[in-house]
Design a protein with these regions (language model features):
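Cofactor-binding beta-sheet edge motifs in enzyme active sites
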Residues: 1-370, 377, 387-696
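Short, basic alpha-helical nucleic acid-contact segments in DNA-binding proteins
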Residues: 378-382
């Protein structure tokens, strides 16, 4: 996208992970070129809702932190000037560990207890423990972050008094509030027009606001339209990633193998700032308790500040990391007590009218037994598990060697997913709206700030208009810019299908009742305000509706390990889902299929980590996302539940597929693996260990 008179911008970044900025040494700039620093900020130097500086001042918190914006008409000239800019910074000792941190580095904490788990563990008996680690993951969206800021005149106003931002964002109103805050303007002077984007996996929820602020600052200083587009490599290095989680679990078991008490320690790497800190810590702690019942439990959670870029959501806000730990732990327990992991889960799963640990009651039937049996039936799980288990036990008495035959295993895991933010105060505005107008000419206009970020739902909304009002889908038009559309909140956590579609349906139903009694045009606006209860922290309210009707899923993964390369090859993935009322089954299957591919990448392919606060360039060059010829057979089936609620389902594969995969590899190797990504080197290390043990 470009406009007449547009200039370009690029970002000057910190070379150190932690320190103090002394000086930015810039060569003499040609005419029409500018270097913009935090001293040019007329408003507040932070994003709305989050403590993220727009441009660093004296304090430097991570390598790659934006220090200045270089602006000019020719991109190649900007790159040449940037190469001659030097940063004088005093380097300080940085923190990169979440397990050996200073107490002052804890951004957010949770201390949750139910019953007396310490006494339960003190009584002795069977105790099972594990340390479960999930590494970071890149969103790898098709287009890097970027923004175009266009100053304009309207009815005699000066050009710099109004601004339109074009950017690919899940949260247009957050962009507006952030830009108006940094410019020192009223919100109404900023219009955000979200551009169409494809699969983003929550990578476009808050970072576009930072890029938009940079472009807007440049437009304010120069009085010209400014386009700032990150290079793909730059985006990869400095944009948020799925945060790392380190979860330790220790459980004592009753005689029948059920969990008598659990003590869980959750440590999360949130990077330099606590973006969505409360939501991520709460959802991770909830996920770490899993889908099974604990007689008593204690959860100690910490979100830790380190000197890497701010970390954030990735296809959810921490449930997946928590569920990986819980589901691996449950499989470990089942293995320890000699039970089929599927049968153990069926005997210990949550039930209707029990509460989630945070206090939200489960109002619907909990269909875990049915889902486990459905996934098992699709995959022939029970027969395969028994067969592979016999082979595993036989190998214990044999010498480990390259016998030529592949080792096979099969794993199962379960999870649930809410639909919306758990924390009522996570965003400034929690009263979200949709507006629908039936025009005289037969057109139907839907106004929602979520539409552009959820373009794949357009046909769903068009079909609703056809079914309720008889409006031809071609006559449905969508408006999403913040100048006309109401605030519908961020497009994440399946809010588009569970909340916005419900509001839209209410608008359409109201118009149907009015259309033959009232003259056209007819406009109806519907809003929703969360029903809140007290959460784990007294001053933090949680949204009861977001998790009262969760979706549920079960995943089975079958693998075989090549006896020469030790690469695990996936023979099949089976997903059984209770998604409530499904509006478009074909689209729902596609959503789950895509999510399963990305979840598989996180589980076994996408090797990525920070080293001394930076991502080595090799990780970017060789980042290994699943290619089409690497995608195994994936089968999805939906449980026919007759539910009236529409439920989010897109995160379920991330929450149950990784644990099922690792369990399958664990059965094949007769070893309890506890981390992802899990690769051939990890398997090779265990293979050598097995050879040493068998030779004794």
């Amino acid at each position: 996208m470009s406009v007449w008179g547009m200039v370009h911008a690029l970002t000057i970044r910190s070379p150190v992970a932690r320190g103090s900025l002394k000086e930015i040494k810039c060569p003499a700039l040609p005419e029409e070129y500018f270097l913009i620093t935090e001293k040019n900020i007329q408003g507040e130097n932070k994003l709305a809702d989050f403590p993220v500086p727009v441009l660093a001042g004296e304090k430097l918190s991570y390598a790659g932190q934006p220090l200045a914006i270089l602006v000019g008409p020719v991109e190649s000239e900007l790159e040449d000037i940037a190469s001659r800019i030097t940063i004088d910074a005093e380097d300080e000792k940085a923190s990169f560990s979440i397990t050996s941190n200073d107490p002052g580095d804890v951004i957010v904490g949770r201390d949750l207890i139910s019953g007396d788990p310490d006494m339960a563990l003190g009584e002795g008996g069977i105790i099972v423990s594990g340390n479960y680690i999930t590494e970071i993951q890149e969103h790898w969206y098709p287009e890097p972050h970027g923004a175009l800021a266009v100053p304009f005149s309207d009815k005699g106003k000066k050009a710099e008094e109004s601004l339109t931002i074009y950017t690919s964002t899940q949260w247009p109103y957050h962009v507006r509030r952030s830009v108006s805050g940094v410019l020192g303007w009223d919100d109404g002077r900023i219009t955000v027009t979200p551009t169409i984007m494809t699969v983003h996996l929550d990578g476009k929820i808050w970072y576009p606001s930072l890029v938009a602020c940079h472009a807007a600052l440049a437009a304010q200083v120069t009085g010209k339209p400014v386009k700032l587009m990150l290079r793909r490599e730059e985006d990869f290095m400095y944009s948020p990633k799925r945060n790392k989680a380190d979860i330790q679990m220790c459980s004592t078991l009753s005689e029948n193998g059920s969990i008598h008490g659990s003590i869980i320690q959750v440590q999360l790497d949130l990077g330099s700032e606590g973006v969505f800190a409360d939501e991520i810590i709460d959802q991770t702690c909830l996920g770490a308790l899993g889908t099974c019942y604990h007689d008593t439990f204690k959860v100690d959670g910490e979100g830790v500040r380190t000197n890497i870029p701010p970390q954030g959501p990735m296809a959810g806000f921490g449930l997946s990391q928590g569920f990986f730990a819980a589901e691996r732990h449950f499989s470990h327990i089942a293995d320890y007590v000699g039970q089929d992991p599927a049968e153990w889960r069926k005997n210990n799963s949550l039930k209707k009218n029990q509460n989630l640990a945070i206090g939200i009651p489960l109002k619907d039937t909990v269909p875990l037994v049915e889902l486990i049996d459905a996934a098992a039936s699709m995959s022939d799980y029970y027969r395969k598990w028994a067969s592979y288990e016999l082979l595993r036990k036989r190998r214990r008495s044999e010498k480990w060697e390259f016998a030529g035959a592949p080792l096979r295993g099969i794993g199962i895991a379960t999870a649930w997913q809410g639909s919306g933010f758990l924390n009522h105060n996570e965003t400034e505005n929690s009263n979200y709206s949709v507006e629908v107008t039936l025009e005289k000419d037969g057109f139907l206009e839907i106004k929602s700030s979520l539409i552009s970020s959820s373009a794949r739902y357009l046909d769903t909304w068009q079909n609703l208009a056809r079914d309720i009002l008889g409006v031809d889908p071609s006559l449905v038009r969508l408006t999403s810019n913040t100048g006309e559309a109401p605030d519908s909140g961020p497009g994440t956590l399946s809010r588009n299908i569970s909340l916005i579609t419900r509001l839209m349906e209410q608008c359409l139903t109201s118009i149907r009742k009015m259309r033959f009694r009232n003259p056209l045009p007819i406009t109806v606006k519907r809003s929703i305000k969360p029903e809140t209860i007290n959460g784990w922290v007294p001053e933090k309210k949680i949204d009861l509706s977001a998790f009262a009707h969760p979706s549920w899923g079960a995943a089975v993964t079958e693998i075989e390990i090549d006896p020469v390369s030790l690469d695990p090859n996936v023979r099949g993935i089976w997903l059984a889902i209770d998604g409530g009322k499904i509006l478009n089954e074909r689209r729902a299957r596609r959503t789950l299929h895509t999510a399963a591919i990305h979840a598989l990448g996180w589980t076994c392919r996408e090797q990525l980590r920070y080293e001394e606060g930076k991502i080595p360039i090799e990780y970017y060059r060789y980042y290994d996302i699943p290619a089409p010829d690497n995608i195994p057979p994936i089968k999805v089936d939906f449980l026919k539940s007759g539910a009236l609620h529409r439920k989010g389902i897109g995160e379920l594969p991330f929450s149950c597929l990784p644990a099922s995969y690792v369990q399958a590899v664990s059965q094949a190797m007769d070893y309890h693996f506890e981390k992802i990504p899990l690769n051939a080197r990890d398997i090779w290390d265990v293979w050598k260990l097995k050879q040493m043990e068998s030779s004794k």
